[in-house]
């Protein structure tokens, strides 16, 4: 069974509480999903990616891997750790036939906010109010671009946001 590409798309957030009110179960879930999920898949498939002679690992982190925002410490800390795992692996695999790319999206309209807010559709919809967010197809197109580069080309990192978003917490429609 040959494996050429691994897309680590492990992600998710639960809650938006300040650190002083952190829900430890939410934090545990976010770290288990974002960090350990990425680690498990990478460890499991790395030998096959190396054996392919031209493997590619794409890790979907987030702009939250570089930024912080009020109430987001559980998610941003997990995404910082996921990014650190990916960037560390980049150095550890030097000389091996595996390329690594980190894609850090901003606001992408998926079920992310619905999960974060425990199924509260109104609260989830409000996240994207007044802006045009990215959609999953935007990220898929970037993955396709990265995967189509020649084997000697490594695209280390791509940050992609909607035009309406400048930082994790600064965007059109949010006062």
Please annotate each region the language model reported.
Residues 102-106, 121-169:
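C-terminal helical subdomain
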Residues 47, 91-94:
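Alpha-helical segment proximal to the catalytic Tyr-Lys
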Residues 42-43, 87:
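A short, exposed helix-loop element centered on a Lys and neighboring polar residues
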Residues 20, 69-73:
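Active-site loop immediately N-terminal to the catalytic Tyr-X3-Lys motif
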Residues 42, 78-81:
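Active-site helix of classical SDR
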Residues 17-19, 26-28:
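Substrate-binding pocket helix/loop in short-chain dehydrogenase/reductase
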Residues 62:
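Residue(s) in the substrate-gating loop at a strand-loop-helix junction
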């Amino acid at each position: 069974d040959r494996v050429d590409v691994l897309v680590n798309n492990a992600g998710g957030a639960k809650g938006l509480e300040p650190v002083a009110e952190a829900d430890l179960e939410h934090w545990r879930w976010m770290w288990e999903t974002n960090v350990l999920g990425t680690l498990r898949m990478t460890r499991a498939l790395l030998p096959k990616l190396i054996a392919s002679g031209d493997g590619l690992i794409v890790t979907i982190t987030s702009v939250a891997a570089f930024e912080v925002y009020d109430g987001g410490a559980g998610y941003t800390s997990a995404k910082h750790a996921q990014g650190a795992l990916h960037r560390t692996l980049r150095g550890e695999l030097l000389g091996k036939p595996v390329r690594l790319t980190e894609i850090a999206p901003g606001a992408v309209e998926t079920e992310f906010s619905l999960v974060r807010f425990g199924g509260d559709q109104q609260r989830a919809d409000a996240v994207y109010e007044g802006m045009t967010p990215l959609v999953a197809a935007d990220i898929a197109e970037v993955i396709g671009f990265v995967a189509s580069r020649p084997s000697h080309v490594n695209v280390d990192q791509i940050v992609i946001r909607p035009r309406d978003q400048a930082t994790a917490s600064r965007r059109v429609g949010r006062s």
